[in-house]
UniProtKB/Swiss-Prot annotation:
<keyword id="KW-0249">Electron transport</keyword>
<dbReference type="InterPro" id="IPR002429">
    <property type="entry name" value="CcO_II-like_C"/>
</dbReference>
<keyword id="KW-0496">Mitochondrion</keyword>
<keyword id="KW-0186">Copper</keyword>
<feature type="binding site">
    <location>
        <position position="196"/>
    </location>
    <ligand>
        <name>Cu cation A1</name>
    </ligand>
</feature>
<keyword id="KW-0479">Metal-binding</keyword>
<dbReference type="Pfam" id="PF00116">
    <property type="entry name" value="COX2"/>
</dbReference>
<dbReference type="InterPro" id="IPR045187">
    <property type="entry name" value="CcO_II"/>
</dbReference>
<feature type="binding site">
    <location>
        <position position="196"/>
    </location>
    <ligand>
        <name>Cu cation A2</name>
    </ligand>
</feature>
<dbReference type="GO" id="GO:0045277">
    <property type="term" value="C:respiratory chain complex IV"/>
</dbReference>
<keyword id="KW-0999">Mitochondrion inner membrane</keyword>
<keyword id="KW-0813">Transport</keyword>
<comment type="function">
    <text>Component of the cytochrome c oxidase, the last enzyme in the mitochondrial electron transport chain which drives oxidative phosphorylation. The respiratory chain contains 3 multisubunit complexes succinate dehydrogenase (complex II, CII), ubiquinol-cytochrome c oxidoreductase (cytochrome b-c1 complex, complex III, CIII) and cytochrome c oxidase (complex IV, CIV), that cooperate to transfer electrons derived from NADH and succinate to molecular oxygen, creating an electrochemical gradient over the inner membrane that drives transmembrane transport and the ATP synthase.</text>
</comment>
<feature type="modified residue" description="Phosphotyrosine">
    <location>
        <position position="218"/>
    </location>
</feature>
<dbReference type="GO" id="GO:0042773">
    <property type="term" value="P:ATP synthesis coupled electron transport"/>
</dbReference>
<feature type="binding site">
    <location>
        <position position="200"/>
    </location>
    <ligand>
        <name>Cu cation A1</name>
    </ligand>
</feature>
<keyword id="KW-0597">Phosphoprotein</keyword>
Length: 227
């Protein structure tokens, strides 16, 4: 969950988000080292009077600044590709949920159950209870079992939307006429908030997403009551 004046990413709740946080720190360290080197060279150029106006050729320097960037790019690309394949791979999901984007709400269908589907609208500000979050609460939360692989099928009924939950490392476009999929797994129970992350019209800001991750026994009880 985000909080005011937060500078970093949200706390990771899924294995994918943990990997993304590690990759973020890895890449940021490389950027920091490169920036420090460039600033150091600039400071030397500004503070020294030594120049090399007669230098016409420097094979060693050219070799270094060709090979070194290539190595740096490889060090960034390899972990990035690993995470991309992890995000794309879905093996034997325990549950499948289909979500459709609408202007301006989400609808959900649990495809493993016959009649388990509902719409999820934002709760207006004037109807919020004490402690509830403005522009983030919904009338029907998406209840899912924790520590289990869940496949999300995502599409749209009208315009482009994007289904995103930052603490789980999820952001998948909802495209009319196309069915995209992603996978999620929460390692601990709780409420996880997200929003539509694709500008989709005048009420784009009023399409929150709330996932309620619960133990499997609670989920089975909830699903039996909903069907």
């Amino acid at each position: 969950m985000a909080y005011p004046f937060q500078l970093g990413l949200q706390d990771a709740t899924s294995p994918i988000m943990e990997e993304l946080l590690h990759f973020h720190d890895h890449t940021l360290m490389i950027v920091f080292l490169i920036s420090s080197l460039v600033l150091y060279i600039i400071s030397l150029m500004l503070t020294t009077k030594l120049t090399h106006t007669s230098t016409m050729d420097a094979q060693e320097v050219e070799t270094v600044w060709t090979i070194l960037p290539a190595i740096i790019l490889i060090l960034i690309a390899l972990p990035s590709l690993r995470i991309l394949y992890m995000m794309d791979e879905i093996n034997n999901p325990s549950l499948t949920v289909k979500t459709m984007g609408h202007q301006w709400y989400w609808s959900y269908e649990y495809t493993d159950y016959e009649d388990l589907n509902f719409d999820s609208y934002m709760i207006p500000t004037q109807e919020l209870k004490p402690g509830e979050l403005r522009l983030l609460e919904v009338d029907n939360r998406v209840v899912l079992p924790m520590e289990m692989t869940v496949r999300m099928l995502i599409s749209s009924e009208d315009v482009l939307h994007s289904w995103a939950v930052p603490s789980l490392g999820l952001k998948t476009d909802a495209i009319p006429g196309r069915l995209n999929q992603t996978t999620l797994m929460a390692m601990r129970p709780g409420l996880y908030y997200g929003q539509c992350s694709e500008i989709c019209g005048s009420n784009h800001s009023f399409m929150p997403i709330v996932l309620e991750m619960v133990p499997l026994s609670y989920f089975e009880t909830w699903s039996a009551l909903m069907v």
